[in-house]
Amino acid sequence: GRAPAPPAEPVALRASASYLVTGGLGTLGLAWTRWLVRRGARHVVLAGRHPPGAKAREALAALASAGARVRVVQADVASPAEVTALWRRLDDGPPVAGVLHVAGLTEDAALGATAWDSFARVLAPKLAGAANLAAAAAAREHPLDFFVGFSSIAALLGNRGQAGYAAANAALDAQIAELRARGVPAWSIAWGPFAANTRPEVLTAAQRRGIAALEVDAALAVFERLLAGPPGHAVVMAVDRARGEPPAGVANPALFAGWTGWSAAPPPAGAERDASAGAADLLAQLAGATPDQRLALLTDAVNATTRGVLALDPAFALAPEQRLDELGLDSLLAIDLVQALGVALGTTLPTTLVMDHPSVAAIARYLANELT
């Protein structure tokens, strides 16, 4: 929903307490660590699976010069044993007053091509990580002032190639709700894509749905408002309201009904009819064609559809045998291509089509064999 009104007073943190940030060495973890220090925190522990890189070390030096004691602990929060060891380290300092659970992992792939091991790896930091951290905190004498889980709009809108990530964040949202039911001041914030740490192709896919990139400073301002209010679940994303409709993929447009100028817009009149007619025309041409003509028609159709998905310059020569991943067709765009070809041909195609047949010519040959 919309951001709450700004708090009368900015959030003040305690210099006599410690604050834990998981995923603390990443772009967002460091941004929120700087916020903690600006708001008065003087003891911060950053947990991550890997040692700090050059940029993180530079950020840590700046935080130290600001008067904060920032410790880095290498730990996988999905491991109960490592979280237990982490909390023993925390017990050496002031009591922990707040947890920012930023840690997460993505392994994008079409669901049909996703192995369970990959799915489980993506679930682990969000689901097991939150459970392990909450259990460790509950075993301590001092209650938390806040526990904030960094979730994603993937749990609300879905995202092509991110079934595991969507499930992980939905599970995190549910787990945070359970913590609130047990009396823990816990927030779950489903963030939209950030400009600072999101791959360009993912931002492009989001923009096609009417979702803009979040800037960290704007997100921090909203975060502070949320933390000054009652614990709960919030969705924070930058949306292109000029579209005049909710973001594409929203299962319940009524969620956005209070936003002026938005409504549950139906598809353009005749859009489905036009798509069906186009598919029927192509299928009719294929039905009366010789094998060589069928292959040529399908090659042209795949070529045109690929150009549209990749937004290629009309002057660019797309070689039939060139691998599409060499042109920037990642797993998300590959799913777009499969769906677009399915519409063009009036059929459902396997989600692994591009993985199995990675060029225009290979896809056309596959279709020529399948559509006989």
What positions do the PLM features span?
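4′-phosphopantetheine-dependent carrier domains
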Residues: 1-247, 261-372
